């Protein structure tokens, strides 16, 4: 029998997680980062296998400057000539500085079905939002900025980014993935100094580069769908290196975060038919679990062992 669990990541996970993605980290690790791992356990063999991971980073761009392109629009019109031209533009900036980010997303696509991948993403997203809800309650303050997630963009069969080849490579010739492996996470901040600061007209780019703006890599579409179901949307910003879209939402607009509550937990011997799946986070420690539970008044009745007396909880949905 397979059961799902959530835990924090550690040094022992690095090698496996690194094998899931060529991109690597988007930022330097900080003490307040939260690294979450979803794993499935074979209860008969008593073996746990990591399945997917993400990091929750606060204060994006405050320690290391981050840049994105804003995808905008300018209009050139001459009514007397009956001309009206709308042009898409790219303007580099730091609009998401201070945001909270869902970062370093990776999944074991080789061993999980699409349905299992989707479930793992839902589980991780709910766990991350529960942690944010608990922290906001403790601090009696709301973190500034939106919640964002930068998705990988399109690459051709040779592994090259058409967008980078059409724009960035004119200013820095090396492939972005190779550059990140050579120089680490700071290379994006450094390379931004070489890229144009003035608006770039998308019509000046090759067709393949234009077509890649805001498009998601096929292998990341499951993650995109999970973000959309959670309440995030495309925010008219893309990554510098591959034009992958940045999804965003104000924290107060996320249904899962608004539904998170601090609830008393009690144990029942068996879950009734109406019980649903809930994600629980212990009030005092970073201990999550997935449990079948029933909402009774303001409290939760949890089937099996109720290890927590008080927990932050949200329906899995």
Briefly describe each language-model feature range.
Residues 5-17:
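A short beta-loop-alpha structural element at the N-terminal edge
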Residues 27-37, 41:
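A short helix-loop-beta-strand connector motif used in the catalytic cores of GNAT acetyltransferases and
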Residues 37-39, 45-58, 101:
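Conserved beta-strand in the GNAT
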Residues 56, 101-110, 142-160, 215-216:
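Conserved beta-strand-loop-alpha-helix junction that forms the acyl-donor binding cleft
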Residues 57-104, 108, 184-185:
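Conserved acyl-donor/pantetheine-binding loop and adjacent beta-alpha core of acyl/acetyltransferases
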Residues 112-133:
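Conserved acetyl-CoA-binding loop-helix of GNAT-fold acetyltransferases
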Residues 171-280:
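Long, charge-rich C-terminal accessory regions
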Residues 281-316:
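Short beta-strand-centered segments at strand-helix junctions
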């Amino acid at each position: 029998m397979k059961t799902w669990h959530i835990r924090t990541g550690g040094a022992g996970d690095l090698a496996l997680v690194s094998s899931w993605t060529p991109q690597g980290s988007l930022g330097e690790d900080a003490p307040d980062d939260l690294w979450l791992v979803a794993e499935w356990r074979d209860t008969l063999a008593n073996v746990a296998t990591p399945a997917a991971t993400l990091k929750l980073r606060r204060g994006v761009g405050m320690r290391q400057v981050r840049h994105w392109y804003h995808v905008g629009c300018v209009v050139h019109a001459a009514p007397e000539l009956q001309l009206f031209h709308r042009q898409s533009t790219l303007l580099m900036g730091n609009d998401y500085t201070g945001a909270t980010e869902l970062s370093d997303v990776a999944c074991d696509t080789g061993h999980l079905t699409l349905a299992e991948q989707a479930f793992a993403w839902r589980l991780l997203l709910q766990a991350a939002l529960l942690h944010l809800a608990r922290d906001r309650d403790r601090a009696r303050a709301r973190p500034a900025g939106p919640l964002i997630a930068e998705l990988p963009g399109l690459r051709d069969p040779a592994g090259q980014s058409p967008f980078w080849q059409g724009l960035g490579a004119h200013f820095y010739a090396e492939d972005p993935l190779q550059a990140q492996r050579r120089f680490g996470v700071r290379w994006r901040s450094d390379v931004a100094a070489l890229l144009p600061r003035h608006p770039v007209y998308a019509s000046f780019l090759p067709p393949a580069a234009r077509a890649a703006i805001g498009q998601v890599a096929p292998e990341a579409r499951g993650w995109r769908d999970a973000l959309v179901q959670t309440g995030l949307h495309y925010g008219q910003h893309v990554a510098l290196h591959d034009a992958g879209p940045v999804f965003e939402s104000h924290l107060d607009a996320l249904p899962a975060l608004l539904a998170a509550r601090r609830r008393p937990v009690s144990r029942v011997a068996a879950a009734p038919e109406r019980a649903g799946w809930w994600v629980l986070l212990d009030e005092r420690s970073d201990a999550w679990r997935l449990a079948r539970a029933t909402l009774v008044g303001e409290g939760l009745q949890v089937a099996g062992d109720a290890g927590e007396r008080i927990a932050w909880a949200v329906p899995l949905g």
